[in-house]
Amino acid sequence: DLYGQLYKLPVCKLFGGSKKKIVTDITISVNDPEVMAEDTKNAVDRGYDTLKVKVGVNPDLDLARLSAVREAAGPDRRIRIDANQAWNPKQAVRLLNQMQEKGLGIELVEQPVPAHDFEGLKFVTERSYVPVLADESVFSPADAVKIMQMGAADLINIKLMKCGGLYNAL
């Protein structure tokens, strides 16, 4: 930040960033499908094009919830799902493939399996049409490297607070 102040540049420019606009999402929390559909309509009315939907609390209901969200969102909105480590690898693949078959248009799934289960994450990544985002699995640069080397995820979410700040994130 001091260099940014010295050179009168935002920190993102100092690190080579060129985007003027970023995509953000709004979280649709787990609830009854009807409530989630209403929350989705409210988010769309507020201008959100990307929705992050919490799933995993009751996998049997996840398809119904996501169907309701997709119907409320329409075909042009992006839907990301966050399972918060709730599924086992086989369950994740089964559910994600069912979502694909139903045409729910899921952009990505965040942390479908427990954080420490890198092999399970890889299992899902190799067998699902839905791209997998590692989140809770990444606590350090070594974790990120291991996940990339293993091919355990398609994407990595780096949280600055979790990994020790901007320097470690880079």
Task: Please provide the spans of the model-predicted regions.
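Residues that scaffold the ATP/ADP-binding catalytic core of kinase and kinase-like folds
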Residues: 14
